[in-house]
Amino acid sequence: MTSETSVNLLDFDAEGLVAYCGSLGEKPFRAKQLQRWIHQYNAGDFDGMTDLAKSLREKLKGRATIGMPEIASDHVSADGTRKWLIDVGNGNAVETVFIPEETRGTLCVSSQAGCAVNCRFCSTGKQGFSRNLSTAEIIGQLRMAEFALRASLGRAPGPNGKAERVVTNVVMMGMGEPLLNYNAVVPAMRLMLDDNAYGLSRRRVTLSTSGVVPMMDRLGAELPVALAVSLHAPNDALRDELVPLNKKHPLRELMAACQRYLKVAPRDFITFEYCMLDGVNDTEAHARELLAVTRDVPCKFNLIPFNPFPESGLIRSKPEQIKRFAQVLIDAGVVTTVRKTRGDDIDAACGQLAGAVKDRTRLAERTGTAAKIIEVRAV
């Protein structure tokens, strides 16, 4: 039986786990063994960790847990996209999405319950900010998804070789602004990269930010993974409206931060994400302005057709307009992709499942009834 003050071992990266084992009087190699059991063999308890001394297993049973996020619902799209809704307590939920492709499998991971940045086109931002996720809640999304996907394919837990791994890429592009939860996100990403955990390369872990400039610099100094920047506008006036954080860190400051980051980045370009909004930011003139503002930053563009949601007041750009916009960028020699819409039959926009939970919670608070996450049957 664990004590009320037990620690969740998923909260520790390698350094933290060494320190914790040291506090139990154990040598550093025990931390490596423990980490492999947790993150490579999906161990849920300590009794099965047969290469750990029985005395250590007994210590751990009295002091520690391997506490996973609670799955509220699991949805599978006709195109293979899979979305989990994770209950993080107090009527809050976050989403984790797996996107299978022919040569890779990408997991989109959330870092916060809600988001304080409040981008105009983002469903999550409309919910407001509830709290930061813990390291355990962040890395737990990858652990949950990797082993659930392996089980669905009949693959056993074990060291994450290329033949066994299902999740080949992680993008910190789910709910929340990762750089506003830096102290929990970075240890989680260290585990993603650790060969004794998930063993992904820095090129295969991408953090997406709306432009928290000071933390971009810190990330570059401490853990430079691939970087994506949510740009969405080619000038400060429009970006102030679409991405309010721009008022604090305007485009000139943001572009300078991107240049600094590239000096240490695992890739030689920044990915700029650009949500295509009909009549707002999608003209050829906007595209030319975009080229001008990013001219000193080696980059590629990822154009994202807007996923409509209630109360946004926005419309997705027409396919032909997206094509014209993209062509301006391509003609200038900039690599440009248009994101495919995936999983429309299970959720039209990131944050909508969690938003429905939030709406039910608010209704419960008004009516005095108990809030509860209701499981949604997989499609």
UniProtKB/Swiss-Prot annotation:
S-adenosyl-L-methionine binds at residues 176-177, 208, 230-232, 307. Disulfide bonds join 108-350. Binds 1 [4Fe-4S] cluster. The cluster is coordinated with 3 cysteines and an exchangeable S-adenosyl-L-methionine. One of its GO terms (biological process) is tRNA methylation. The gene is rlmN. InterPro entries: Aldolase_TIM, Methyltransferase_A, RlmN_N, RNA_MTrfase_RlmN, rRNA_lsu_MTrfase_RlmN/Cfr, rSAM. PROSITE patterns: RADICAL_SAM. The lineage of its organism: Bacteria, Pseudomonadati, Pseudomonadota, Betaproteobacteria, Burkholderiales. It comes from Burkholderia vietnamiensis (strain G4 / LMG 22486). This is Dual-specificity RNA methyltransferase RlmN.
